[in-house]
């Protein structure tokens, strides 16, 4: 048979690039005789040695041969280079340029959007989204500028996503609210196949009430300290930016918050609590609430500890019943518990009936007030009860807790059978003088003047 050269065809997959960005090129040699020696590939003038698959030659019915070879290569590897298929037989060489599998160039549409002023103020940061839509080929470069200067951080660009033969991507810029409201210009710059597009957006000129976070630490309740093995410390952070992190430490040791960060009463506040042992609190150890956020140059810290009290004063407890005519004539009567002469001011007062806790809605405690010499404090509590309950012989106790009390708790109990013709019961410390007893009696006497009005208020409530 007479030798004949191969006819070469360059092939390109009609499918768009795979999700990994790879392309498939084909080289088909037909109608040649005798068989060819080799099929190879080049990118410009550089040999390609990977991604190749050459199939065995096939003898056709008319006595000639056909052979094919496939090249798989990524779009980024091809770039702007040209791909060639080279066929050899002895000293003869045939070369075929393969069509561009990347398709036509399509430059992207670039759109900038921003979060609303209300969202920026509440979250304490602005979000600018640069949407890069419908481009081909896949390779792009995205950068951000602030007032014309390149930014090195504060933005994240997503991987490209291919749909229907084109690609899309997004780049998200985050700007602290304090900086956003200074009228700076931010630019999203997109480069694609030698063409650069820029889109600008200007921060708002509206002033922002973006004050620094403020930390307020709350100690445990005195009732917790006196009655429980663990106590709760509370950290309230106002003016808190969105995504703020609150943690606790004791000296250099991190503490685990028992309750995660949660919204406070205000939209821009968060609350974090931690449980510690009562013994640790009473020891005077220092506990820190640490507030951290990307907008803060350094974390904010505030500390709390139990202050040492040297001049402890134990309270005296006195109880007054409504006047006798009220007991007989009214459906409701009142008991008043006066607690005085104590220091420091932290104290709790509550009531029980027959050793069961009374609903706090049935009694009213006043604020703790300083006595005349300002060296001690007093408080009183007014309990409203039904006359028939009192007549049944129920026992009512005023329960007082204070750190100066040896057993931490004082119970003062009265009932219908208590022996007191003037309806006043007084329990005093042994150190109390006759003058103290007299002052207590006088205070209770004046309180009794207002009992009818006080009981009425409690009933209305």
From Swiss-Prot:
Residues 206-308 are annotated as: CH3. PROSITE patterns: IG_LIKE, IG_MHC. It is a single-pass membrane protein. Keywords: Cell membrane, Glycoprotein, Immunoglobulin domain, Membrane, Transmembrane, Transmembrane helix. GO terms for cellular component: plasma membrane. It comes from the Eukaryota. Residues 1-99 are annotated as: CH1. Glycans are attached at residues 164, 200, 245, 275, 374, 411, 415, 437. It is found in: Cell membrane. InterPro entries: Ig-like_dom, Ig-like_dom_sf, Ig-like_fold, Ig/MHC_CS, Ig_C1-set, Immune_Resp_Modulators. This is Ig heavy chain C region, membrane-bound form.
